[in-house]
């Protein structure tokens, strides 16, 4: 299990083109290095047993129950099942994610049907993905996705931290307290680094999008699913 600290920012056409030029090496940003970009297509389907956000919260349903079909560079389709618990801190997501590959997706769809789950909503994402380093923060790996989601353009950047990084040299209650303090400190530092990162592209981190994808796609302020 790991923590995702993630920021997403809406882009204009010109901003999208600029970020694309940078990750494809047509433009340069001082202090930034990027891996070769991969072309992604993701189709996500979200499931729930309830009809409202209040019901979901009352019954403790995970924030995200998702099936994802994904291709990378037009290669074979891979499918993943994901459960995610989400927290929003200063409009930046801090998520705990559990994910497994699925060799036969039909098994999961039968499970959903027989267990009383229904599809909540879906989204499609066309993206370019790469890993980036800032010279000022060489120990951080920034996973960048430049994306079009249901016809709108976005930049998503995440830092992934492993909980195991905080589990050394302590035990029991002290270990739990130390791990929580370390996690909060790491989250705060990672949020700052994400804001520094998007500034490299002349983007304003105050424009970070606090809404879920469900709210963005449907225009709804209720029944948050992702």
Locations of regions flagged by a protein language model:
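N-terminal strand-loop-strand beta-hairpin
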Residues: 1-139, 164, 203-226
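Long, contiguous binding/interaction regions
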Residues: 73-76, 110, 148-159, 163-166, ...
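Charged, well-structured binding/catalytic surfaces in domain cores that contact anionic ligands
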Residues: 129-156
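Intrinsic-disorder/low-complexity detector
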Residues: 170-171, 176-181, 185
């Amino acid at each position: 299990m790991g923590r995702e600290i993630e920021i997403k920012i809406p882009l204009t056409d010109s901003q999208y083109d600029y970020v694309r030029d940078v990750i494809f090496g047509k433009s340069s940003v001082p202090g930034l290095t990027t891996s070769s970009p991969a072309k992604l297509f993701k189709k996500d389907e979200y499931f729930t047993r309830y009809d409202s956000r209040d019901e979901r919260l009352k019954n403790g349903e995970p924030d995200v129950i998702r099936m994802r079909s994904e291709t990378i560079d037009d290669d074979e389709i891979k499918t993943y099942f994901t459960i995610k618990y989400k927290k929003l801190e200063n409009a930046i997501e801090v998520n705990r994610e559990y994910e497994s590959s699925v060799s036969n997706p039909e098994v999961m769809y039968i499970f959903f049907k027989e267990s009383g789950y229904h599809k909540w909503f879906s989204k499609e994402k066309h993206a370019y993905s790469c890993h980036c380093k800032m010279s000022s923060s060489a120990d951080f790996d920034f996973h960048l996705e430049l994306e079009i989601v249901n016809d709108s353009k976005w930049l998503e950047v995440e830092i992934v931290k492993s909980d195991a990084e905080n589990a050394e040299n302590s035990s029991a209650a002290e270990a739990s307290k130390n791990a929580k303090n370390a996690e909060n400190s790491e989250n705060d530092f990672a949020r700052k680094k994400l804001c520094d990162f998007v500034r490299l592209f002349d983007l304003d981190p105050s424009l970070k999008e606090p809404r879920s994808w469900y709210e963005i796609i449907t225009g709804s302020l209720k029944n948050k699913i992702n």
